[in-house]
Amino acid sequence: MMDNDDALLNNGGPQSGAETVYGTEDNNMVMSEKNEQVVSIVQQLAGSIYQEFERMINRYDEDVVKNLMPLLVNVLECLDASYRINQEQDVEVELLREDNEQLVTQYEREKSARKQSEQKLLEAEDLAEQENKELATRLESVESIVRMLELKHKNSLEHASRLEEREADLKKEYNKLHERYTELFKNHVDYMERTKMLMGSTHSQMSTASERMDVSRARLNPVARSSGPVSYGFASLENSVMLDTETICSVGSQSDDSGPPSLQNELDNLSGTLERGAATDALQQQHHATSPQSPDSSPVVPNVPTNVGRSTTKKEQRSDNNLYQELSFQDNEESEENEIVTGSWVHPGEYASSANDNYFGMGKEVENLIMENNELLATKNALNIVKDDLIVKVDELTGEVEIVREELNAMQQSRTKLRQRISELEDELKKAKEQVKQQNTEQEENDVPLAQRKRFTRVEMAMVLMERNQYKERLMELQEAVRLTEILRASRTVDNLDRKSKQSIWKYFSNLFTPSNRPTERVADGLGGGPMFRHTGGGSPAHSHGSPSRGSGGGDNRLALTSGQPPVHPASAGLANALIMPKDYAEEGSSERISARRREQYRQLRAHVQKEDGRLHAYGWSLPINKASQEANPNRHSGGVPVPVYCNPLAEASPHMKVFCAAGVNLHGGFTKNGQSLIPANSPYAPKSTLKIAEITSPTADQSMEALDRQMARVSLETLEPETQLSSFVWICTSTHAASTVSVVDANQSATVLDAFPICASHLLCIASVQGAMESDYALLEQSEVVKAGEMLQRPGEGTELLGKVEFVRVKPKSDDEQNSNEKQQQEEEEAKEATEKSNEQLPAVSAEEPLGNVEAIKIRQPLPGAPQRLSTDGNQTNNNNNSSSSSNLLFATKSLNPILETKDRDEPAMSSVGPTMWLGAQDGWLYVHSSVGRWHECLHRVLLPDAVLAIVHVEARVVVALANAQLAVFRRQTDGQWDLNSYHLVTLGDRNHSIRCLCVAGERIWAAHRNKIFIVDPVSLNIVHSLDAHPRKESQVRQMAATGAGVWVSIRLDSTLRLYNTHTFEHKQDVDIEPYVSKMLGTGKLGFSFVRITALMVSCNRLWIGTSNGVIISVPLAEVQPKSSSDPHGQMPLCCMANAQLSFHGHRDAVKFFVSVPMLQQPNLNGGLTFTNKRPDMLVMCGGEGYIDFRINDNDMENSIQLEPNQTIENRGDKSYLIVWHVSQR
């Protein structure tokens, strides 16, 4: 037994990552299989003891067991308490195990995140180091350039200083030469005076002297001219002239011994000084010298030929006249002038002998010195130029050496970086190899169920984060809060559990002492593996319905699909016998990698679906074979299997149009106060009424037999399900980025859009159908306390949230300007609509022969009058006797015929809100009221509410609207039957920062969901009757509610569990988790099906229709439990079992948006009205969502089946909103 318990715990325990849901009443909830087996053990013991006591009482007497009874009860209570303690400990162990797994996964996640952050930090540090190194290299290059510029600047300063020193030396030389010149001039003057004196005494020698003077003058002519080659500074002279000059100088120097110190010594000293100065400035390099460098050289005369010969190595350039040449030329002119001025006679011989010898000797010496000085200066200049060139060359070479050194350092740094990069790449290669190994091991674990795995793989976590990133943020918080809440609840309710167990045991054994009420049935053992369903009915025992597992059951329990159904018609019966389903399957991505991965996932999904043993696939549904639970419930009406009859996009022309909500049209009512109906009598939907309203509302009116008959008919009509009272018309709200549109379709002909018109620029969040004014509505209006009290019906709230506050709001009447602006706005809207209609009419019609894509024909059981037919542009039906290939072509058209009033082109009479209406709520707070009979596009009333409108319901001649600020707006009719939108009541249900997500009508009361609470409100008195917590955590909001019979099914945000509550006692009856079922049917989460969230919920055809966030559609047949009193028709409890659940292989790519159920056909009676009977009509269940998917498609057939239209992409095909319609027979 313990082994079986452990196995059951392992198979049915909470999975890692899934949310655990806890109820409020342990007697009416199913926690796990082990809990039920523990209770069944106690029940078995109690049943066996009960039988023994019964035999003892029958054989002996009641006194035998009176003393033994308390002891046995105490023993059973202790045993029950021990079992419950064991259950709580098992729950705590499971919670601790889940916490441990979550902590491990969180630790691994944090560890990987830390590794990633460290890796990013290292990369940032590497980038910073690289930038710093680059900046450092730039700084070093700038510093080297600065050093080079400083060196050049220093060299230029040194060169400037040397030039200044040279200039100073030249000035000194000039001063010395000037002083020497003055001395020479004085000596010359003295010599001339002496010569004059000598010429006066030696007159006899005049003739000879004159001749010698002519010869000397002839020789001196080249020298005396200031324009000669020497006087003008040329370095090369004529040889003849140089020889003559040397001869003269030699003669002069030998003849004169008594003069002043020789000029040659001073010039030699000066040349030596200049040579030493030049030697200090010149570099130590060999160069052709133009003059001797040794101070001990021979006299000037022997050096002259050498200088002349060497002068050919340099350019011959003209220099300025030196000071001596100019002065010597002036002296000759002055001597001639003196000779002319003085009239004294001078002997020519004396003049020639003295003047010529001295003059020519001194001039030659001075000339040689000057030439040597010029040559030395030219050599010095040449050496300085060479020195400067060498300095510049050295600077260039130094800069190049620095640049090469920097390049070498940069190459070394790049080499070290490349080595580091190579090491990093090697490490990454090692990590990649390890990851490949891990992925190989993870792929081997893909077929292992989640319950048997130790943790989630990285691939699964990545898929979950990608598909449900908006829910993953709060998953850990919700699980932690659930765990804490469960611990607190378990600690608080231990005493309550003991008390309840004692009461149940005493109540169980109390029947022993009442022989008249002694049961005749044995207690059924609860050994089934499924959940138990119990009802609290008197002293009857609890019945346990087993849930057969997959693959159990023999051939006798096989489901009969065709029992009670018409025979299958052949395919040649026409287009009405075929289901046209274009395979508009959209791609999720355009890249090859994503496509290959998706094909692999679909292949695994298809393989998983095909290996499901023990289930039957029929009409696109996965059906259980075992019918043990159905045989145990004879009151159950499953109604066969839903058959798909239609699947296509809602609007082919608008691929980006998204569906939001839809509602079936209720055409009942519509009577004025005088008993006149707004629907014409010739219409097949015209109601039948022969009694005036005044006769009913009048207190003196007699109750005739017709009124009683009509009342009985109304009662019989109310006993039917609400969806059976609807017509087959459906209003579907769609929205784009620009505006929201309503499309009116007939569910019998879903391919035909009867009308489509815009409503507003905001999104339409909800829609509801409200029947017209009935006779009872006028009686309620006159007798209502709300109408009598008016604004007096107000009530203050309780607490800080003002819970239950009722306030009356009256809308101010509009001024004339506002009315004119509204009329002008309506006129512009009508013009825009007409322009849109004209543009649509001008579009080319699609030919009937043009295919719209690959289609798939599925045979159905009977021809449907509402099957999609081929339509022409004028709305008439074309010939159906075409080839079988033409049946794949489908044309979507919009009928201009109103089937209710039988009018064309919107040529209907004026409508009012007395008749049936459609109420639409927008996101911007506007509430719109349109007629559902005629002139659908015209808005009858509209009002701006304080916040967004989220839900609308109609009950007890009132319309209740749920707002996003936690308030309910209640509207009522006026005395003339029209709806009053100028005044309404607001009921506050909680914190205004949170919204009322959904509304539900259960009986005559409203169930409003605010966060995790459900408030039951009386729509007449506006009082809060009761409130209950659907979930222990406030952040877990109630999202959907569906009422039927005596129960209300509730779904929670971020939760895959449905909860059932009793509408009368508000008790929690059952919990149903759909996540294990979806995981079992569609795999272990490859496509994200393991994280199931409920987005659409509806009860219809005795089935619970469930739509999930990933497009999966589930239909669960309900097992109704009969109430205690048969007089209450609404007392059936709609329990269900997931073992009988049916999963549709036709689904959506995104969340399921809505379910709508309408009657399939309503045949008009002979009197012109609709005939309503107690028989259950066949129903059409419509589902809407984004995209279409078939979970059975093989590999890449889904991508290959897509045929794109012109100017259309695969992404646009996936954006379309699809409608899927099933036919459900209830006969």
Swiss-Prot record:
Comp. bias (Gly residues): 526-540
Location relative to the cell: Cytoplasm
Record region (Disordered): 1-22, 281-323, 517-572, 804-851, 863-889
Entry superkingdom: Eukaryota
Coiled coil feature spans: 84-191, 363-489, 814-849
UniProt keyword Transferase, yes or no: no
RH1 domain boundaries: 25-113
SUPFAM superfamilies for this protein: YVTN repeat-like/Quinoprotein amine dehydrogenase
GO CC terms of this entry: cytoplasm; Golgi membrane; membrane; neuron projection; presynaptic cytosol; trans-Golgi network transport vesicle
Listed GO MF terms: JUN kinase binding; kinesin binding; MAP-kinase scaffold activity; signaling receptor complex adaptor activity
Main location: cytoplasm
Composition-biased stretches (Low complexity): 290-308, 541-550, 879-889
Keywords tagged on the record: Coiled coil, Cytoplasm
One GO term (biological process): regulation of JNK cascade
RH2 domain mapped to chain residues: 453-524
Subunit-level organization: Forms homo- and heterooligomeric complexes. Binds the TPR motif-containing C-terminal of kinesin light chain, Klc. Pre-assembled syd scaffolding complexes are then transported as a cargo of kinesin, to the required subcellular location.
Annotated function: The JNK-interacting protein (JIP) group of scaffold proteins selectively mediates JNK-signaling by aggregating specific components of the MAPK cascade to form a functional JNK signaling module. May function as a regulator of vesicle transport, through interactions with the JNK-signaling components and motor proteins. Syd is required for efficient kinesin-I mediated axonal transport.
Family from the record: Belongs to the JIP scaffold family.
Protein name (Swiss-Prot/TrEMBL): JNK-interacting protein 3
Gene behind this protein: syd
